[in-house]
Amino acid sequence: LGQREEPRRAQPRDGELGEAVERAQDGDEAAFAVAYRIVQPGLLGYLRGLVGDDAEDVASDAWLEIARDLGRFKGDGAGFRGWTATIARHRALDHLRRRRVRPRSSALEQDVLDLPGPHNTHDQALEAMSTEQALRLVGGLPQDQAEAVLLRVVVGLDGPAAARVLGKRPGAVRTAAYRGLKRLATRLGAEGVTDEAPRTLGESK
């Protein structure tokens, strides 16, 4: 696929997030609220891709666990995003098992590992979409590709972090994410994206 390993993609507020988490671990409730406000939008978008309308309830359960286990977390702001995504994913899968429903995009699991840098056509295609449009289109991808795209674009994880969330090898996650983003770009008629849109996507309207 010609992909290159990329350095970790820092999110704009990761520094602020890391500081807030550190203060929250020392008992600062206002700092925990700051961390929540930074992380919650992406986490909720990820959960919507997994459990649909039940995302808010699952997110509430996840945050209870995050608050309870906060003292055990070690890492920076980017690490906290990955840690919270892992907890949210476990709660989502528990929820789906209880309901005995298959994940809408079970492989909403994969990520986006080491994709080409932040300004490539695939990212631009997704950035042009609203969250609602993105989730609708992502829901039409194969499961592994869908979750990979959600972790990269909605949660904002880098490749290695997404691989840890999913318990998969970086290479497998990287490939799934690349293919998922390429399919989405092709569906959107993104300029400069050619060829191999897999048939699965081409068949859906």
Q: Would you name each region that the model predicts?
A:
Residues Q25-V34, L44-D61, P170:
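Short, charged helix-capping/linker segments at alpha-helix termini
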Residues G2, R23, R164-V165, L181-K205:
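C-terminal edge and immediately downstream basic/flexible tail or linker adjoining helix-turn-helix-like DNA-binding
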Residues V21-G45, A67, A134, A146:
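A short, charge-rich alpha-helical start-of-domain segment used by transcription regulators
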Residues D57-L64, A78-H90, T175:
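Structural recognition of an alpha-helix C-terminal capping motif at a helix-to-coil junction
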Residues Q25-D26, G49-D53, D61-F80, R98-R100:
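Sigma70-family region 2
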Residues H95-P118, A125, D195-E196:
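Short, basic/polar amphipathic helix motif occurring as a linker/hinge flanking DNA-binding modules
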